[in-house]
Amino acid sequence: MTTSLLSPGTPEKSLPDSWRGEIESRLAAGETIESWLEIDLDSRLQFARGLVVATTRRLLAHAPGAGTWESWDYRPGLALDHRDHAGVGTLELVDAQGRLASWRYTLGHNVTALKLLRAFEEQLAS
């Protein structure tokens, strides 16, 4: 029996199998995925795979080339900034002290990045 990790009514296609096992082991009881973005550039703008996930409780990320996952619980003052320049999109997670994380992707993923941003903002506001 397969259990969906996505919230009911989530428009995103299902999470790629290559990430599913890693995400399942990190979700707390009752925590579901609201949106996700498979990124395709590392910090040097070289092609590499990573994943950013907005859940009902937090933002999870596995940066390209990183050996570990990072996690940030939703809290006041946390923001996800979006911008693009010259074919490269950037999402930056920031708080009052500064940048916490940054992820880059080719603009072919921009629509999905905007969905992730919207899900993040909705969860942060709830």
Predicted segment positions?
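Short hydrophobic/aromatic-rich beta-strand segments that constitute the beta-sheet cores
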Residues: L59-A63, L93, S102
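Short, charged, intrinsically disordered terminal tails
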Residues: L5-G9, R118, E122-S126
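Canonical phosphoinositide-binding patch of PH/PH-like domains
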Residues: D95-L116
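Generic detector of well-ordered alpha-helical segments enriched in charged/polar residues
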Residues: R20-E24, L114-E121
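Anionic N-terminal interaction surfaces
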Residues: M1-L51
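Phosphoinositide-binding peripheral membrane targeting modules
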Residues: I39-V88
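Short polybasic amphipathic segments
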Residues: G89-D95
